[in-house]
């Protein structure tokens, strides 16, 4: 019996340091996926024109990539119309008159159906190109508001709060002058969904869009520069638009921190990258495999876009997509081209 007890004790003593070693061992970090490399594109060798239209948010990013494409030798024309995401899909799917649609939201089922009804039919392919943070802004002359809860933001844009004092009794009893992108804008769609419809925010459900469209003292525009100027013009104005437009006028505007339930968080590279800022959203360009195969210049432009977007996106004022998201976009390009 003593020998058996001693044997068991020996096993315990031997196992103890192994357990300690196992606890101290540091698990290996999962390596980040290597970027997929697309075939090299020489802009000097690309001929033909490219027509794009859509999101005003994606517009400055596409403009920067197109300028780089031209700077490196492309001699054709790149048309980029800022008509809102909905307007872009109308021209791409409803009329079939553009090669690329710029979008600040995913394509809707109704838009996919419109693409399928074209002759020849189109199938929209999404290419993720970056991330935008929606900036909720006031004039730099506003000296009382630094942050809003998601519920306060929803109350303002749904018309439930008419004055700043309705949001916070310590703020002025002055009417809130609202500025919003129009209903054709993907930015508008995203705001309605993320702020007004969301259960933990506005909780307006199917009534959300009607609420903002019926709000008093609100100005809508598909031109973000009009919204910027409107907010700049009054200390009692409140607006929202893509972070790049805020960045251009940061000396005259103030971006408010947004509290989604874990404390106020201001938009920045770090907070967007960490997933801490509530109002961050993906940016896309869309095309179709047949369009890309029939128009090599379109395929080459999208290839160039996906290969070079990270070199310009920071200067524009947006945030890079993850390697994984860009790899999915690059793989979608390869699949569309049968490679």
Label each residue range with its predicted role:
Residues 89, 180-265:
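Ligand-binding pocket segment of bilobal, Venus flytrap-like solute-binding proteins
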Residues 125, 131-136, 175-177, 253-254, ...:
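Small-molecule pocket liners
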Residues 31-159:
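N-terminal segment of the mature folded domain
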Residues 51-55, 138-139, 164-184, 287-288:
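Short beta-strand->loop
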Residues 141-147, 184-187, 201, 291-295:
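Short helix-loop capping/hinge motifs at secondary-structure junctions, enriched
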Residues 2, 42-47, 275-276, 284-339:
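Extracellular/periplasmic juxtamembrane helices and adjacent flexible linkers that interface
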Residues 111-126, 247-273:
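Ligand-binding "clamshell"
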Residues 9-44:
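Ser/Thr-rich, Proline-interspersed low-complexity disordered segments
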């Amino acid at each position: 019996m003593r020998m058996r007890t001693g044997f068991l004790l020996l096993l315990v003593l031997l196992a103890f340091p192994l357990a300690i070693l196992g606890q101290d061992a540091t698990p290996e970090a999962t390596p980040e996926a290597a970027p997929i490399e697309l075939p090299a594109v020489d802009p000097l060798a690309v001929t033909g024109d490219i027509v794009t239209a859509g999101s005003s948010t994606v517009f400055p990013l596409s403009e920067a990539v197109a300028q780089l494409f031209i700077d490196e030798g492309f001699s054709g024309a790149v048309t980029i119309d800022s008509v809102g995401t909905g307007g872009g899909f109308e021209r791409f799917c409803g009329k079939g008159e553009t090669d690329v649609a710029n979008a600040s939201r995913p394509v809707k089922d109704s838009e996919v159906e419109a693409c399928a009804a074209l002759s020849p039919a189109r199938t929209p392919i999404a290419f993720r190109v970056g991330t935008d943070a929606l900036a909720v802004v006031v004039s730099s002359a506003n000296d009382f508001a630094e942050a809003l809860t998601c519920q306060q933001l929803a109350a303002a844009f749904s018309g439930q709060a008419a004055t700043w004092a309705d949001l916070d009794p310590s703020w002025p009893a002055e009417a809130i002058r609202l500025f919003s992108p129009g209903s054709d804008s993907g930015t508008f769609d995203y705001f309605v969904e993320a702020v007004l419809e969301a259960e933990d925010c506005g909780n307006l459900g199917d009534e959300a869009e009607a609420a903002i469209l019926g709000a008093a003292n609100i100005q809508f525009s598909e031109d973000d520069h009009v919204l910027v100027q409107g907010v700049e013009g009054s200390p009692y104005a409140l607006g929202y638009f893509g972070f790049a437009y805020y960045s251009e006028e940061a000396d005259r505007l103030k971006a408010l921190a947004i509290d989604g339930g874990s404390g106020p968080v201001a938009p920045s590279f770090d907070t967007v990258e960490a997933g801490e800022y509530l109002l961050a959203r993906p940016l896309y360009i869309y095309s179709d495999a047949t369009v890309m195969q029939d128009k090599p210049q379109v395929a080459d432009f999208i290839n160039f876009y996906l290969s070079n977007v990270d070199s310009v996106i920071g200067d524009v004022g947006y945030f890079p997509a993850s390697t994984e998201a860009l790899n999915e976009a690059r793989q979608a390009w390869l699949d569309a081209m049968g490679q």
